[in-house]
Amino acid sequence: MKRDSDMKKTGSTSDFLPTRNRELLQTLRRLIMTTEGVPLGGLYAMAAQSPCSRFWVSEKRAAEVISRMMRGEDTDVKSLPLRNKMYRELLRRVQEWQAQNPGRPLTDAVFAAVNSPAPEFYVTPESAKVIISRIMQRKRR
């Protein structure tokens, strides 16, 4: 049985896996069609670092982490470099949104930030390869 500390947080990326995974696969396919001379491993890295339609985390989870960051509290994402990078970018966008919309609730700022285009998928090239390989295996069955 999993301990609470081993389980994913409610509202984490896992709520969006099918949509994120489809978008990642589409990105890889586009790169395959438009990029010459790059080995497949390089294409996985390029796909992982490509812009995507949104940040793949729920507004609820993002609000929890960003709120703690704004209060200077320790977050549980510091040991995960890409997660940390993603939340730092979300925090930057939230603060920018709040400066332009004073008096509005944090939840509005987080909603706007999470649902804005993200600069990358925030997954490692190795994770991108595993994600896409699993999708392709399911399609073959």
Question: Can you say where each PLM-predicted feature lies in the sequence?
Answer:
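Short, charged amphipathic recognition helices of the HTH superfamily
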Residues: 32-51, 97-117
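Short, basic interhelical loop/turn and adjoining N-cap
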Residues: 48-65, 112-134
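A general marker of short, structured functional hotspots
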Residues: 12, 40, 83, 117-118
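Short, leucine/isoleucine-rich alpha-helical interaction segments at C-terminal helix-coil junctions
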Residues: 135-139
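Secondary-structure junction/capping motif
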Residues: 39, 58, 74-77, 81, ...
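Basic, amphipathic alpha-helix used for nucleic-acid engagement in HTH/winged-helix/SANT-Myb modules
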Residues: 1-33, 45, 50-99, 140-141
